């Protein structure tokens, strides 16, 4: 749940920093850091205060609404007339579409590269072990509480970074930008798992990117079918339910090996 508060937090922080004359690159990093701080708060409440994860997310989301409003000063703030990453790229002669695609590829490539490097270090392996099997990680001497907090910080930092980039693409920051962030993220991950499985870490991260693009593409197709925009959330929910059900269908339709071809089978 923290994700839906961290997303607009990154957008709000970056927008205000840009308006105050800070370089868009540093402003974008500022949004990332703000998200990490929000994640640290969630991680602290969950690990040290022993508040359940779901309640932690709800509490942080509720608090971040006021924080975001305090940062922005109003429900939405425009970046019109200010220099952003998008205007910097379009200033090189690229169209806005090509510039946004270029920025997206650059940031996605950097994030994937840095995550692959991090998750293959000793700290990264401890982080992965904590996520895969908490009890086993703790039994092997891993300080799981620290790893949880680190995981909260990294994930919410990246979510806030996404909000910072979207604000610069749209030209404004809005209090409600984070609505649906969790659904979109889950859909991208699950769709990637449905399409391909058992990939190395780097390729798995890229498959999630592809899943996110495919999910948004399907939503665009739904809108192109003259579906009422008010029904888009319902369509998203139905689509997510279908995506979640696909693995179950595949399991039911899975063809079992012929007994005659298995060791000990009839000849």
Predicted regions and their residues:
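Cytosolic-side transmembrane-helix boundaries in multi-pass membrane proteins
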Residues: 132-139, 143-146, 203, 218-267
